[in-house]
């Protein structure tokens, strides 16, 4: 326990400041103990509940009571001296602790007062500090302005030079002119010597100016060096970024080219596979139809030996087995196609997913221009996806076509009569049928013209893809001369490749050239034999062997001169002709549109007056094919109408509109005789070259009304590989009433099948 002196010393330490400890002495004790009150207290409860209030109430009575006269209530003996001593010592301790408590309370109150005072002083000090900081900020701003002003004045001083100012040699003042300086010297420095002091004043000023000039030059050099270094660093960074963009673009282009090549290869394989399967099915169908036709032809033959008993059941069973085998094979092929399409679709989806991930990764690192290129690639991918869907639709249509052919064969087999000669079904006949399968396909297509409508979208898509591969868009109305020259070189290379691939290519071309030339000569000779009316010029040539090259490349015409019709023509006549079961329709040309081309003063054989098709296909030759057949009289101006884009589409409405001709016009008989001769020549079948596709014509539907005279037909065809064999089967039935006028390419499809009965006749579908 500390002594009172130590306690006083602790209270008067630095923590409590200069607090004075009051004088302490023990008080006398005269009060008696209140035993009744003590007996009511529960000491255990006070200790358990920490009842400090009860202790505070009883502390005074216990501390200041006198226990010397206390005796035991039971035995009446006084309190034990040792116990009494302990109780008195406890009273003294409690009294001292109460004194310490009072001192501490007073010290705490004093310290709280001092704390409040210190807090007030601190707040005032902070306010003063903020005010001084504001003042310091203002002083700094003022100092900065003054430094700027001084530097500006120094720069002006260095720029203008010291000779512009007049400095007093006796003080630091400077004047604008010498008058002010003299006045200043007279006022302030009268009678003062000038020599030594002026020199002392000029030397420090010159030194300061030189030092400032040196610092300025050094600062400018440092700034220039820093600018140059920063410029070099920016150039290097820009070059590095540009190189990275170029490398990323090259990688993206290479990857895109590889993916395009892979996709085109897969599409070509799939198209080739489907085309081979379709050819096989068509061959089988044509074979069965030929057998059915043979059975039908044999059924009408009557035996002169009497009624014979035919083996109908065996023949019917054999045909049923063949039909069942064909159905099974068709189902197998269909299943195989579906499986292959599914595999290709799964592979395409996997590749598409990989390409999308790769595309996203590349797009994150591409610049704005490369993102635009990636968007264009995405559009092309969408186009290819649409083409694949179109291919699937075409496959479905082919399957429906195969089913329809199979059903038709079943009906034909059930209609076979009983009188069948079993000896005709020999292996030799099957061999001949397999060799003539192409002719059977043609016959089947003639009997069912609706099948050709299914092939038209396929051929249109193929042609559009081929044109797009050569750089010609689908909606292009024409091509430039530079593009035409590029396509000419490309087609020339492709023709050379085909000539190397197919050994008979050149010989077939030569054969076709000779055949066309010979037919043109025959038509010319036949046309020259026909007599002419009086006052009319003679026939020059029907088709010249010279193929005139037009001003625009890839356009060739064959000129045919026809005589003018008499002033009063005979009444209209009707005629019908047939070749290979196809109808030859009369050609009637509408009046040319005056807004398109004006009349030409030169004969139509001259090049610049002709129109050029927007493109030529890859199978075109240099000068051995007919693109336009022009039938014109001499000294008659011609009008050319550009060929529209969709010249394959025509309708009954268009043909009926073209048939509305003004009455009262006559015609000659020259064209009729020429058409008959041409039909006889075209009836002979010609060998189809490799890669050629025939144009099939429908059976003749009846006579047709003669076309309006006063027109000169001009027939033209695209130079494509689909038209190599079209010259063998193309009928040109020219009306005997026609007066020669140019027939434009845009109106050519509308002329076939016109007349009073044209709406009921089947159209001539073309591939």
From Swiss-Prot:
Zinc in keyword set: yes
Pfam families xref list: Dzip-like_N
Keyword Acetylation found: no
Biased composition (Low complexity): 607-616
Region (Disordered) residue spans: 122-144, 518-767
Bias kind Basic and acidic residues: ranges: 131-144, 677-686
Record's compositionally biased regions (Polar residues): 533-547, 574-588, 658-675
Transmembrane segments: none
Keywords for the protein's UniProt record, in alphabetical order: Cell projection, Ciliopathy, Cilium, Coiled coil, Cytoplasm, Cytoskeleton, Disease variant, Metal-binding, Phosphoprotein, Zinc, Zinc-finger
Record-listed Phosphoserine modification sites: 426
Coiled-coil segments on the chain, per record: 205-406
GO biological process: ciliary transition zone assembly; cilium assembly; floor plate development; neural tube patterning; protein localization to cilium; regulation of protein localization; smoothened signaling pathway
Gene Ontology cellular component terms for the protein in this record: axoneme; centriole; ciliary basal body; cilium; cytoplasm; cytosol; intercellular bridge; microtubule cytoskeleton
Zn-finger (C2H2-type) residues: 166-189
Protein localization: Cytoplasm, Cytoskeleton, Cilium basal body; Cytoplasm, Cytoskeleton, Microtubule organizing center, Centrosome, Centriole
Similarity comment text for this entry: Belongs to the DZIP C2H2-type zinc-finger protein family.
Disease note: Polycystic kidney disease 5: A form of polycystic kidney disease, a disorder characterized by progressive formation and enlargement of cysts in both kidneys, typically leading to end-stage renal disease in adult life. Cysts may also occur in other organs, particularly the liver. PKD5 inheritance is autosomal recessive.
Subunit organization: Interacts with SEPTIN2.
Protein name: Cilium assembly protein DZIP1L
């Amino acid at each position: 326990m500390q002594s009172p002196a130590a306690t006083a010393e602790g209270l008067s330490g630095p923590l409590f400041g200069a607090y004075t400890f009051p004088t302490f002495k023990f008080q006398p004790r005269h009060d008696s103990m209140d035993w009744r009150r003590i007996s009511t207290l529960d000491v255990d409860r006070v200790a358990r509940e920490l009842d400090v209030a009860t202790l505070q109430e009883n502390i005074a009575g216990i501390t200041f009571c006198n226990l010397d006269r206390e005796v035991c209530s039971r035995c009446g003996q006084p309190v034990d001296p040792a116990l009494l001593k302990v109780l008195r010592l406890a009273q003294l301790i409690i009294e001292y602790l109460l004194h310490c408590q009072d001192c501490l309370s007073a010290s705490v109150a004093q310290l709280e007062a001092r704390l409040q005072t210190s807090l007030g002083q601190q707040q005032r000090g902070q306010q003063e500090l903020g005010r001084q900081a504001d003042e310091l900020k203002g002083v700094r701003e003022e100092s900065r302005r003054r430094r700027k002003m001084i530097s500006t004045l120094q720069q002006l001083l260095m720029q203008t030079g010291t000779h512009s100012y007049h400095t007093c040699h006796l003080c630091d003042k400077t004047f604008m002119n010498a008058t002010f300086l003299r006045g200043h010297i007279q006022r302030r420095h009268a009678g003062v010597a000038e020599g030594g002091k002026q020199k002392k004043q000029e030397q420090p000023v010159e030194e300061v100016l030189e030092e400032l000039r040196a610092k300025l030059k050094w600062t400018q050099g440092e700034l220039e060096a820093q600018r140059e270094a920063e410029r070099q660093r920016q150039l290097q960074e820009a070059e590095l970024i540009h190189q990275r963009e170029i490398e990323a673009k090259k990688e993206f282009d290479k990857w895109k080219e590889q993916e395009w090549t892979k996709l085109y290869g897969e599409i070509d394989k799939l198209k080739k596979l489907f085309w081979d399967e379709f050819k096989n099915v068509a061959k089988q169908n044509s074979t069965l139809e030929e057998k059915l036709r043979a059975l039908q032809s044999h059924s009408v033959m009557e035996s002169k030996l009497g009624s014979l008993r035919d083996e109908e059941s065996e023949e019917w069973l054999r045909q049923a087995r063949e039909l069942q085998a064909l159905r099974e094979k068709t189902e197998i092929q269909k299943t195989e196609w579906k499986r292959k399409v599914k595999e290709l679709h799964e592979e395409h989806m996997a590749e598409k997913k990989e390409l999308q991930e790769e595309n996203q990764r590349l797009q994150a690192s591409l610049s704005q221009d490369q993102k635009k290129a990636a968007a264009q690639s995405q559009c092309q991918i969408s186009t290819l996806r649409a083409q694949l869907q179109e291919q699937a639709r075409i496959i479905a249509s082919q399957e429906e076509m195969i089913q329809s052919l199979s059903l038709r064969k079943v009906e034909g087999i059930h209609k076979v009569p009983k009188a069948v000669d079993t000896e005709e079904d020999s292996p030799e006949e099957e061999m001949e049928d397999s060799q003539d399968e192409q002719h059977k396909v043609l016959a089947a297509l003639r009997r069912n013209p609706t099948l050709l409508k299914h092939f038209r979208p396929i051929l249109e898509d193929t042609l559009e893809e081929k044109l797009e591969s050569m750089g010609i868009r689908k909606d292009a109305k024409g091509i430039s001369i530079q593009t035409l020259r590029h396509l000419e070189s490309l087609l020339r290379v492709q023709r050379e490749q085909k000539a190397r691939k197919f050994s008979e290519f050149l010989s077939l071309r030569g054969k076709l050239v000779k055949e066309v030339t010979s037919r043109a000569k025959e038509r010319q000779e036949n046309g020259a034999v026909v007599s002419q009316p009086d006052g009319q010029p003679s026939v020059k040539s029907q088709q010249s062997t010279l193929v005139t090259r037009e001003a625009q490349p890839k356009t060739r015409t064959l000129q045919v001169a026809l005589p003018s019709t008499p002033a009063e023509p005979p009444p209209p006549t009707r005629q019908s002709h047939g070749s290979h079961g196809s109808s030859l329709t009369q050609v009637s040309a509408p009046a040319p549109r005056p807004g398109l081309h004006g009349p030409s003063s030169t004969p139509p054989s001259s090049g610049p007056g002709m129109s050029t098709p927007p493109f030529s296909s890859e199978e075109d030759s240099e000068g051995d094919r007919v693109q336009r057949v022009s039938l014109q009289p001499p000294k008659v101006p011609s009008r050319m109408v550009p060929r529209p884009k969709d010249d394959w589409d025509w309708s009954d409405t268009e043909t009926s509109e073209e048939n509305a001709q003004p009455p009262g016009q006559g015609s000659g008989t020259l064209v009729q005789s020429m058409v008959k001769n041409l039909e006889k020549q075209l009836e002979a079948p010609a060998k189809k070259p490799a890669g050629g596709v025939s144009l099939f014509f429908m059976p003749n539907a009846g006579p047709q009304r003669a076309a309006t005279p006063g027109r000169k037909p001009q027939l033209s065809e695209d130079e494509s590989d689909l038209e190599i064999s079209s010259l063998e089967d193309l009928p040109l039935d020219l009306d005997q009433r026609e007066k020669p006028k140019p027939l434009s390419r845009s109106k050519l499809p509308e002329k076939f099948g016109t007349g009073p009965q044209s709406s009921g006749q089947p159209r001539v579908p073309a591939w």
